[in-house]
């Protein structure tokens, strides 16, 4: 069985094989217990797109890159916060959205939380599950370059054939549904 001592604020798992227990079965494809395939972490449909244009000495180049389909099951302290004992845990603002059923708690009541109650000593709430399976598809503006080519009649006065001034930026925008704690 997966875990014991269940309480309010724990994740509820479905008994898929109907045996009355939440378990991993025999861990085989024929007898997987209450597990099933819920995603695919392999990036599918990778893309890159170059766009460029010029007008009266000005030029603009854009490079987009991304993945159109990918599933991600977050794990570890960065996602869960309270994981691995009180001396090895980290807490960021999103981790404060955890289950609290005590109206006198300093952070207040939170019965509709994103995270289960924090538990350092038990991984039962951190099993692979659809609740925390994330869409890791993204599109990123990897590079933008904006430039201006000075007219040759001006540059030749300084014995220069060609002079271009430009400004460039990297990773300026990312569009994703992935949790803000992660960079796709």
For each predicted feature, which ranges?
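Acidic, glycine-anchored loop motifs typical of Ca2+
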Residues: 15-33
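Extracytoplasmic loops and strand-loop junctions of Gram-negative outer membrane beta-barrel proteins
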Residues: 28-37, 42, 94-96, 124-132, ...
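Flexible, surface-exposed loop regions and adjacent strand-edge segments
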Residues: 33, 77-87, 178-184
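Hydrophobic, lipid-facing positions within transmembrane beta-strands of outer-membrane proteins
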Residues: 45-51, 58, 141-146
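Structural signature of outer-membrane beta-barrel domains
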Residues: 56, 67-71, 151, 170-176
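Repeated loop/turn-to-beta-strand initiation elements of outer-membrane beta-barrel proteins
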Residues: 57-62, 153-154
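Membrane-embedded beta-strand positions of outer-membrane beta-barrel proteins
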Residues: 62, 165-167
């Amino acid at each position: 069985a997966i875990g014991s001592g269940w309480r309010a604020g724990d994740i509820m798992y479905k008994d898929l094989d109907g045996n009355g227990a939440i378990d991993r079965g025999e861990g085989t494809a024929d007898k997987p217990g209450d597990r099933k395939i819920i995603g695919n972490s392999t990036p599918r449909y990778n893309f890159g797109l170059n766009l460029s244009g010029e007008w009266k000495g000005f030029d603009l180049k854009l490079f987009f890159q991304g993945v159109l389909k990918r599933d991600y099951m977050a794990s570890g302290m960065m996602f869960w916060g309270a994981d691995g004992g009180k001396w090895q845990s980290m807490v960021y603002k999103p981790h404060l959205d955890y289950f609290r059923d005590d109206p006198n708690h300093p952070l207040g009541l939170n019965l509709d939380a994103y995270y289960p109650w924090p538990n350092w000593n038990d991984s039962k709430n951190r099993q692979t599950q659809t609740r925390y399976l994330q869409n890791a598809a993204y599109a990123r503006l990897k590079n933008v370059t904006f430039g201006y080519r000075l007219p040759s009649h001006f540059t030749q006065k300084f014995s220069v054939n060609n002079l271009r001034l430009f400004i460039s930026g990297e990773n300026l925008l990312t569009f994703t549904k992935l949790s803000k704690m992660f960079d796709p």
